[in-house]
């Protein structure tokens, strides 16, 4: 949606509701965040029964490196070549910390499995096929996992990326006035309450997410467009393949 707006395919929406959206959760007057998605780790309780739960990526790196017999073939993460979310999370990790590339190399040596989507990783951890899944959407896991699940959600303490679900009004909309009304409702107090309590999509002011240690919202700014450049994306994916896939 950022690229669509940058390329001129979205309408400006200037209302009291859109003006109330925090600056980090909107881009110009065209792209607006309406819900939050913490990016988390999922662990298998059975596999971690006698292991310390890592709270930072440095701890995760040391843990999987020192327990290769447990984690060999049993770590999952997004495939950034086929998943837009996976590419976004990987590039944000790389921007945030050099640990990402060391982590990718170790996961590669342990033959990490690559996935298209969060739901597949959740299922694999819950069944015990994976011991750990890295960088998946927390709200999906909260919505899908039963109370007695084998899977446990872990939010890192060094930093937790927060993905923004966003909305736009396309210039091709056949009912732009209706689109603006719906957008205004999404980001209104009533709309945010419904998203938070009924749709199970954390609202922009969600109190649980607000308390996460070192939360890092993926801000809607021009930095997101950098990695959409064709040459930069190709370079990043080459580095990724060299680190993780290690062909």
Which residue stretches match the model-derived regions?
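Extracytoplasmic ligand-binding site segments that recognize negatively charged/polar headgroups
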Residues: 1-126
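A ligand-binding cleft/hinge motif common to bilobed small-molecule-binding domains
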Residues: 1-3, 126, 131-150
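A bilobed periplasmic-binding-protein/Venus flytrap-type ligand-binding module shared by bacterial periplasmic
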Residues: 40-47, 89-91, 163-175, 194-195
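Extracellular/periplasmic bilobal clamshell ligand-binding domains
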Residues: 211-247
């Amino acid at each position: 949606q950022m690229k669509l707006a940058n390329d001129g395919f979205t309408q400006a929406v200037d209302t009291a509701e859109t003006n109330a959206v925090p600056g980090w959760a909107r881009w110009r007057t065209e792209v607006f965040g309406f819900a939050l998605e913490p990016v988390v780790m999922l662990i298998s309780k059975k596999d971690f029964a006698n292991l310390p739960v890592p709270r930072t990526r440095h701890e995760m790196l040391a843990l999987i490196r020192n327990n290769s017999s447990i984690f060999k073939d049993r770590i999952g993460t997004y495939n950034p070549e086929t998943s837009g979310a996976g590419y976004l999370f990987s590039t944000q990790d790389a921007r945030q910390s050099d640990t990402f590339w060391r982590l990718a190399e170790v996961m590669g040596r342990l033959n990490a499995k690559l996935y298209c989507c969060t739901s597949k990783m959740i299922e694999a951890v819950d069944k015990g096929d994976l011991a750990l899944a890295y960088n998946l959407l927390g709200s999906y896991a909260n919505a899908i996992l039963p109370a007695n699940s084998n899977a446990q959600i872990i939010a890192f303490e060094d930093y937790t990326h927060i993905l923004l679900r966003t909305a736009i009004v396309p210039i091709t909309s056949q009912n732009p006035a209706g689109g603006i009304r719906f957008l205004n409702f999404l980001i209104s107090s009533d709309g945010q309450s419904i998203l938070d309590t009924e749709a199970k999509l954390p609202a922009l002011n969600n109190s649980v997410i607000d308390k996460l240690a070192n939360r890092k919202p993926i801000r809607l700014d021009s930095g997101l467009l950098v990695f959409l450049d064709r040459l930069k994306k190709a370079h990043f994916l080459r580095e990724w393949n060299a680190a993780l896939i290690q062909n």
